[in-house]
Each structure stands twice: as structure tokens, then as C-alpha cells.
A protein has these predicted regions:
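Short, solvent-exposed polar/charged micro-motifs at secondary-structure junctions
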Residues: 75, 100-104, 131-133
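Glycine-rich phosphate-binding loop signature in dinucleotide/nucleotide-binding domains
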Residues: 2-3, 59, 113-120
Length: 149
């Protein structure tokens, strides 16, 4: 099996996409996930992070997008990535019935990648628990901030 070592992982919400307009729905003790996802279509791209993804791709990195979004949001996610002219090697998303914490879902995605011959070296994320997981797994992780836990 071919081993891909030049792999970079990018998160979507808060990383590739600016979600400041809808973050308010999940920052209190009573989280309103329905509204949080309902306003996803109004997200805007983060030029700085898209630029980084394009630069890494131009330098020979395989780009894989790992999102905590559910599969039911795949079409809008693909549309948002296309708007930013990003064509990842893969877009990994959680199952619609998966309610585990993001860091658990993404750790499983990482295991799947490694089992498939991909050995990511870089991750870009905004959620502290996920940033910690990437780093614990040996990846260099760029924390683009914005999320508090």
C-alpha cells in the first residue's frame, strides 16, 4: 500500500468557514443545534485558511477535510468548499446518528486515514479539544481559534 506522508487535514466550521454569525446558538448551556445548523448556508469562507489550504496543495500536500458536520449537510459543505475553489482528496463527515464529541469522531477518521495509507502531518482546527487530540496523535496542529469549550 502506498503511504501518503504529505497530508494536511482541515476542519470546516470555524476553520475553513466563518461561523461567527451562528456560534451564539451553541455557546450557552442550552445549545440550539437546530438553529446552529439552519443558518449554515450563510457561512462565509475564511480567506486566510483557504489560502493556506491552496498553498499546501500547491506544495504537494494531499488535502483532506474532516468535519464534525453530519452527512445530511454534505451538499452544502461541498458547495461551500467549491466556492472557495478547494477540491479535497476526501471530505469526511460524521454519520447522521453520531452524537459523540468531535474529538472522538475525528480520532476515528484519523485511524481510518492511517489504515488507508494516509499519514497526515498537519491539521488545522479551531476547537481546543480537537486541537489537543491532533497534537496527542503526533500531528502539527494550527489552532485558528474562535471556539471556547
Amino acid at each position: 500500500m502506498t503511504q501518503y506522508d504529505r497530508v494536511a487535514i482541515f476542519d470546516v466550521d470555524g476553520t475553513l468557514m466563518d461561523i461567527d454569525h451562528r456560534r451564539k446558538y451553541v455557546q450557552s448551556d442550552k445549545k440550539d443545534w437546530k438553529s446552529f445548523f439552519e443558518y449554515m448556508e450563510f457561512d462565509t469562507i475564511r480567506d486566510d485558511v483557504f489560502h493556506l489550504a491552496h498553498a499546501l496543495h500547491k506544495d504537494g500536500y494531499v488535502i483532506i477535510v474532516c468535519s464534525g458536520r453530519n452527512e445530511r449537510h454534505r451538499k452544502i459543505t461541498e458547495k461551500q468548499l467549491a466556492f472557495g475553489k478547494l477540491k479535497p482528496q476526501a471530505l469526511l463527515m460524521r454519520a447522521d446518528d453520531d452524537y459523540r464529541p468531535d474529538y472522538e469522531v475525528k480520532a476515528e477518521m484519523l485511524k481510518t486515514m492511517r489504515d488507508s495509507g494516509f499519514n497526515p502531518k498537519i491539521a488545522v482546527d479551531d476547537r481546543p479539544s480537537v486541537v489537543k487530540m491532533w497534537r496527542d496523535e503526533g500531528l502539527t496542529c494550527f489552532d485558528v481559534g474562535g471556539w471556547s469549550e
